[in-house]
Amino acid sequence: MAIERYFIKEGVKEMLIDEYLEKELRRAGYGGIDIKKTPLGTKVIIFAASPGYVIGRGGRRIRELTRILERQFGLENPQIEVEEIKNPYLNAKVQAVRLAQALERGIHFRRAAYSAIRAIMRNGARGVEIRLSGKLTGERAKSVRFYQGYLAKVGNPAETLVSKGYAQALLKLGVIGVKVAIMPPDARLPDEIEVKEIVEEEVSGNEAQ
């Protein structure tokens, strides 16, 4: 049980760090983190479309982030590395954050989702799925799914080949959850069914989970 509690605690900590960095580094095209324990401390890889923004002038921002990760989140001797995302349109986290920003700017959810899908597919993705959940048009919360192309949904391919990202948009009606899944150009699987047009459908309560 002690080991289980440790991994749960570490998982929660990584989630909280991810949420914090998403807010702080939105302008950098934040695309997620990878945290690894090392003999010298904790290695933290930050994926971003604009590494220069993460580093800051004279390294000021990255030093401040290092201090916060150590003092606020309890990471032991954090060593931050920044890895550039070569194509932000194929990183699901970046796209989820950008879509959330579009919703916060007042762009209609349908227009924002369609625009994101077209941009992602133009950049070579084999498939993409977007799920928006919350009070999108009124007082009743609902979940809407948009998708195009081919996307592995179950099994090992879904875990290893599909880029997944989540973000939240804070609107007057409440919080909108934004989930994005992207199948990259180099993913190849047998027995594929491809959807050539963008499809939109409202998802029932159970399916939306």
Curated annotation (Swiss-Prot):
Matching Pfam families: KH_2, Ribosomal_S3_C
Keywords: Ribonucleoprotein, Ribosomal protein, RNA-binding, rRNA-binding
Family annotation (InterPro entries): KH_dom, KH_dom-like_a/b, KH_dom_type_2, KH_sf_prok-type, Ribosomal_S3_C_sf, Ribosomal_uS3_arc, Ribosomal_uS3_C, Ribosomal_uS3_euk/arc
Gene3D superfamilies, per database record: 3.30.300.20, Ribosomal protein S3, C-terminal domain (3.30.1140.32)
Record GO biological process: translation
KH type-2 domain span: 17-86
GO terms for MF: rRNA binding; structural constituent of ribosome
This protein's record includes keyword 4Fe-4S: no
Any one GO cellular component localisation term in the record: cytosolic small ribosomal subunit
Disulfide-linked positions: none
Source taxon at top rank: Archaea
Function: Binds the lower part of the 30S subunit head.
Family: Belongs to the universal ribosomal protein uS3 family.
Entries under PANTHER family matching the protein: 30S/40S RIBOSOMAL PROTEIN S3 (PTHR11760), SMALL RIBOSOMAL SUBUNIT PROTEIN US3 (PTHR11760:SF32)
Assembly description: Part of the 30S ribosomal subunit.
Listed name of the protein: Small ribosomal subunit protein uS3
Organism from which the protein derives: Thermococcus gammatolerans (strain DSM 15229 / JCM 11827 / EJ3)
